[in-house]
Amino acid sequence: MDFLPTQVFYGRRWRPRMPPRPWRPRMPTMQRPDQQARQMQQLIAAVSTLALRQNAAAPQRGKKKQPRRKKPKPQPEKPKKQEQKPKQKKAPKRKPGRRERMCMKIEHDCIFEVKHEGKVTGYACLVGDKVMKPAHVPGVIDNADLARLSYKKSSKYDLECAQIPVAMKSDASKYTHEKPEGHYNWHYGAVQYTGGRFTVPTGVGKPGDSGRPIFDNKGPVVAIVLGGANEGTRTALSVVTWNKDMVTKITPEGTVEWAASTVTAMCLLTNISFPCFQPSCAPCCYEKGPEPTLRMLEENVNSEGYYDLLHAAVYCRNSSRSKRSTANHFNAYKLTRPYVAYCADCGMGHSCHSPAMIENIQADATDGTLKIQFASQIGLTKTDTHDHTKIRYAEGHDIAEAARSTLKVHSSSECTVTGTMGHFILAKCPPGERISVSFVDSKNEHRTCRIAYHHEQRLIGRERFTVRPHHGIELPCTTYQLTTAETSEEIDMHMPPDIPDRTILSQQSGNVKITVNGRTVRYSSSCGSQAVGTTTTDKTINSCTVDKCQAYVTSHTKWQFNSPFVPRRMQAERKGKVHIPFPLINTTCRVPLAPEALVRSGKREATLSLHPIHPTLLSYRTFGAERVFDEQWITAQTEVTIPVPVEGVEYQWGNHKPQRFVVALTTEGKAHGWPHEIIEYYYGLHPTTTIVVVIRVSVVVLLSFAASVYMCVVARTKCLTPYALTPGAVVPVTIGVLCCAPKAHAASFAEGMAYLWDNNQSMFWMELTGPLALLILATCCARSLLSCCKGSFLVAMSIGSAVASAYEHTAIIPNQVGFPYKAHVAREGYSPLTLQMQVIETSLEPTLNLEYITCDYKTKVPSPYVKCCGTAECRTQDKPEYKCAVFTGVYPFMWGGAYCFCDSENTQMSEAYVERADVCKHDHAAAYRAHTASLRAKIKVTYGTVNQTVEAYVNGDHAVTIAGTKFIFGPVSTPWTPFDTKILVYKGELYNQDFPRYGAGQPGRFGDIQSRTLDSRDLYANTGLKLARPAAGNIHVPYTQTPSGFKTWQKDRDSPLNAKAPFGCIIQTNPVRAMNCAVGNIPVSMDIADSAFTRLTDAPVISELTCTVSTCTHSSDFGGIAVLSYKVEKSGRCDIHSHSNVAVLQEVSIETEGRSVIHFSTASASPSFVVSVCSSRATCTAKCEPPKDHVVTYPANHNGVTLPDLSSTAMTWAQHLAGGVGLLIALAVLILVIVTCVTLRR
């Protein structure tokens, strides 16, 4: 974004606040926002109070007390101020801290409120030479000069920017890109910056704070706040900040924009709309009219301002919005009451109607905490007041109290209760198959309910433990927050049904008397004309019996929980809702760290000595195309050997961070020793190849020796046989010597050649050319052998690396992080230039299409509707997997008696549907379709005085300009991606896995519920939900359902791609990408300008350059040290370069001081490479030893090609062997040729 500030032209300086200039249209300081004025007044008052507190004397304290002793009368202004000062002492926590005072001082000039319809929605900030306002904040800046500016909008950074007016530039703050980890300042105090993220304690910051700046400890702005993401005890801030070269936006996952809402929610009552937070109607106070108030809330239950309306109805303050307090979190429960419901097991194996009925248990917290909902209410008294030591429960039609200390929760043993409020209990229980809740009532009787519930300890991390450790590491987890404040979670309430009670009916002389005891009673009978009615006073039904009467206690002044074990009053479901405590939040849990593995390295393997305290998971993966992945739980002390291929391996032990191993080419023997030591050396590196070569050489030597012996034997036979058959024949001297004939007498060589010339000239030439042919043959064999070995050696060492002399240059750099590419660019008239390119980071990002999100579900079962003496009918509702069924022949009973009193048949309408579980916002999986991936690479380019890192998309051609030089990167040689076309993302893990399409989920499988987002209304569900017939006599809604497919997938899922990705890829999920995959090469073309070179006349001049290698360890990262000696005729700085891939130099340039030490890395045992310093060159030759360690934790920065890599000593021995064998064969051939020539001559 080119209009963001990249330089600061105006610094901040201190000066007294001046009055408005006559020509300046800016309003006086008094028109600054009221909030800031109040803050400044509070600051001045707090500082004054602090000064008075430190410097006050005894007479001054006496003066403060004098006005109190006088009679009441109008006080002057001065004593009033003195009376107000002590009030500040009562609330010292309101005094701004040092950080807040500093920010308020700076903010007074550089930030302005943004208002929409008179309401503050955010802030704008003057930074550098720009005014910045978050783009998502509606409204205009509350300043006439700034409001009329023309703003440019950047959707990438969510900012609107404009140039600051000249008259206001002195008010702007500086900014800085330097952000060392630590604490920074903003309006509410300290901001922690660690790991590239800004965080504040949860509860600090809210909607309306968007646009506030974050300052460093000296005053410059380091970031601008846009929003926040709740992460449990901390809130991660979404900010726009500055890096060294660019502006960047940091957006944590789950970020909510902090612009204040501008919409006023409206509610309805009898077709009259009003603001929900400020109702102006008569029945809007619960204390004045409970029943109409509840009905009003039921009619607006789906309104966005429902809770504002509920708050106004409870507090009965219609004139203004009242401030909510922590002490009033229980006040919403004034509208509710506990209840009694059917419990199948009341502690002794029998059923009952219990006030301790367990409605629901949630075990979504990964720290093992259970959230239990039951029928009674904790922390409330029967008079609707708050008392955390009390439990109120339903005792018939009344409400009774019990002591909170008698509450017990049991599993396989007693649980620890950690929090209670309303209907909810937080408890940590040992693993078990049941849960029971009990308390002792006011009559000293135990009220218990028990249900079957399987629960076990959840696994956090990679070690199974039972006790929280004192020392370890913190891992992300979830827990139920111990807060009673309003949350986003809620439960449904409804008007309770009429409760049958036969105890209020009594028989008196043929009449039935109804004793109401101050209640409202609805009655019905089959006697006379007074069949049905409602009464609030005692009533007598004449000429009737109790068996023909039924009485119901009616109470519509309070809600109760919408329980499936209590019938609802009406078929049309009317409900309200209240917030529930203890929301599920993200936090961190301390987990143990197993003792570190002891590593013993071997040849291409590493042995881990493991000493686990708990069952601990060990996993490893190898790099390369053919990956190997394995994991196992280690329960006892053991040793595990893992292979270490050439590409490397990564293992993770328990909760420790992953460790990587790379093979070091170590071996026994010596590359520069005797033949058996050389064979031992190469056998350790390449056993198969060494065995094959040794066998082949041995066979060749043996065959050569056998052939030589055979030729000698044949020659001797041919030359001796004629003389043996001829009596008196004399063997010539030459033949005798060649054939080892005893007593041989032969003519001299000259006589023999003269005889051949006279008698057979053909034989003369044959005998003359034999030795010459043998000499030529030996020479050719030696040359061929030397040429062959030398060619192979040069090919292996890649002699002749890139030296470019053309104007357009091309190169191919490896797509491997940390592996440098270096080239020597030569241009006529200029000193050679060293070019180095190195991949710093790669990111393979696929194009994703979100198919749906899936998670656990919860089954909502509303209270059943029982139609007495009639038939109920189901109605279609637009809810996920909505099921409705009507069952006849039911005879429900409640604690007060039969619910229905008639001769005809009763029916029960049961309903159930599926919703996303509350845990979904913390625990869900996203199903994506992956398409073409883009490969983004960060490449560090160094040449001359240029050292810059650039980003390029190398899956195609991407041009980048670096210091005036145009570089074109890509396309990468090997298009590859680790992602399949269908992928799943779950809690930072990625899985290549197939999944059903949207709307085709199956019960019990992944995707049984599906939605586009976590709060959308397009939820699809197929969980196999079926309603069952209720048991006779009980009010309940039985159903069957397939267990959650998401939970099943969690248990059965395979290892994620994060743990087994090939080529060393690091898988990230926010966004989805594969980092640092070592696959393929990246072609580069460039056009280096002349200005990047140094002319020969300006370059340093050195001569007599020599290179001496002092020490060398091959296959080690820069394990070689060489000393360059030279004479300096003109000093300066010279580029240094190796002209061979055999060795990679660590240094790029050196200062010419006559002697320089350089470091190089090589995989060769006898490297020989040319080093150039400026225009001079020298050859470095070394004899390297193998490294001592078999396995190392870092890759070496050199060419890993080692075959055929023969050391100079091995080459010498090979030449000697070849020369000896060749000489033996040559002698045998020479003897055979001479003998053949002589025999043919005869």
Curated annotation (Swiss-Prot):
It is an enzyme of class 3 (hydrolase). The active site is at H136 (charge relay system), D158 (charge relay system), S210 (charge relay system). InterPro entries: Alpha_E1_glycop, Alpha_E2_glycop, Alpha_E3_glycop, Alphavir_E2_A, Alphavir_E2_B, Alphavir_E2_C, Flavivir/Alphavir_Ig-like_sf, Glycoprot_cen/dimer_sf. Residues 719-739 are annotated as: Transient transmembrane before p62-6K protein processing. It comes from Mayaro virus (strain Brazil). A motif (Nuclear export signal) lies at residues 141-151. Structural polyprotein: As soon as the capsid protein has been autocleaved, an internal uncleaved signal peptide directs the remaining polyprotein to the endoplasmic reticulum. Residues 14-101 are annotated as: Disordered. Structural polyprotein: Specific enzymatic cleavages in vivo yield mature proteins. Capsid protein is auto-cleaved during polyprotein translation, unmasking a signal peptide at the N-terminus of the precursor of E3/E2. The remaining polyprotein is then targeted to the host endoplasmic reticulum, where host signal peptidase cleaves it into pE2, 6K and E1 proteins. pE2 is further processed to mature E3 and E2 by host furin in trans-Golgi vesicle. Residues 82-111 are annotated as: Binding to the viral RNA. GO terms for biological process: fusion of virus membrane with host endosome membrane; proteolysis; symbiont entry into host cell; symbiont-mediated suppression of host toll-like receptor signaling pathway; virion attachment to host cell. Residues 350-353, 386-388, 508-511, 540-546 are annotated as: Interaction with host Mxra8 receptor. Residues 110-258 form the Peptidase S3 domain. Residues 96-110 are annotated as: Ribosome-binding. Residues 26-42 have a biased composition (Low complexity). It comes from the Viruses. This is Structural polyprotein. Keywords: Capsid protein, Cleavage on pair of basic residues, Disulfide bond, Fusion of virus membrane with host endosomal membrane, Fusion of virus membrane with host membrane, Glycoprotein, Host cell membrane, Host cytoplasm, Host endoplasmic reticulum, Host Golgi apparatus, Host membrane, Host nucleus, Host-virus interaction, Hydrolase, Ion channel, Ion transport, Lipoprotein, Membrane, Palmitate, Protease, RNA-binding, Serine protease, T=4 icosahedral capsid protein, Transmembrane, Transmembrane helix, Transport, Viral attachment to host cell, Viral attachment to host entry receptor, Viral ion channel, Viral penetration into host cytoplasm, Virion, Virus entry into host cell.
